[in-house]
């Protein structure tokens, strides 16, 4: 039986969030609605989730000693990682000492780098994936590319949001793709994965919730990426019944293997009735921002319920929906957003501005959401709203 105490009192139910981006911000809001005391931790001050948490700490989360000090001081009932760049070995130690890591410390450790999760999916669970090789040196990387052939994809084993990821079409791309992968890794230069290119029709995120009542699959989310970064997403993605059933089979296999409770974003490639596993995040997914307008319970609300051991009897879909990112390029610590009235002038639209404290280059600063009679109409509406927003530096 779940019991939630009073925030900022001796009975408080405390959640410590590791990583305070826009996804974490929505998780904090949902936890706050359920009366949970939330402590937010990230490497920089005034991150989005810090702005809505009870209190916050600025810590390099790859520093296990510093991370442990904060967790031991706060004594949270739940530790909820929101990003990959965390000292996962420390989380494993803390879990062994009695702390609860969501969904599990092992899941966080396996998914923080592409090697752990790929080997689990392909070699232990025998799930369909692209052919792949790992490489530590340029020589091994060049051999992997030669073996897999063109086109192929190279990614750092540790990165997120498409950083360091590129498509190779010929030998002319070899050096620049290697250099780009070395620059884009979360932990600096290092190991890469080279993947054979799959001739897929579309890719989906199957948001999968492990909760006290079992496993719930949300309607598949389609999305469009540029340079490995999400630009727009929509729900539901049209699929054949066979492809949907296979997607759910793959998602259940990998989330069962990871264990624990919470929402997982399972990324899959689809062609006809064929499905290939790509990646999984043991937390809400950026493409799942569309659920803020498409469902009665967003992915963030579902994550909060699952964490706390609360039931999820049903998730109601409101109809075809879409999200389109607000992705300006500039340099500022005082960004402003104008023309919001025009962006919200159509029915069934919404905007989330993330409140990121600075921009230095291209950065996702918000998202526009829309519902309509069809996915195509919803996508067009969300894109119109996004394009209407004027970003001032």
Curated annotation (Swiss-Prot):
Give me any GO biological process, just one: 'de novo' IMP biosynthetic process
Q: Which GO terms describe its cellular component?
A: cytosol
The record's catalysed reaction(s) read: N(1)-(5-phospho-beta-D-ribosyl)glycinamide + formate + ATP = N(2)-formyl-N(1)-(5-phospho-beta-D-ribosyl)glycinamide + ADP + phosphate + H(+)
| Keyword presence, Kinase | no
Role played? Involved in the de novo purine biosynthesis. Catalyzes the transfer of formate to 5-phospho-ribosyl-glycinamide (GAR), producing 5-phospho-ribosyl-N-formylglycinamide (FGAR). Formate is provided by PurU via hydrolysis of 10-formyl-tetrahydrofolate.
Q: How does it assemble?
A: Homodimer.
- What protein name applies here? Formate-dependent phosphoribosylglycinamide formyltransferase
Species of origin: Pseudomonas putida (strain ATCC 47054 / DSM 6125 / CFBP 8728 / NCIMB 11950 / KT2440)
The taxonomy runs: Bacteria, Pseudomonadati, Pseudomonadota, Gammaproteobacteria, Pseudomonadales
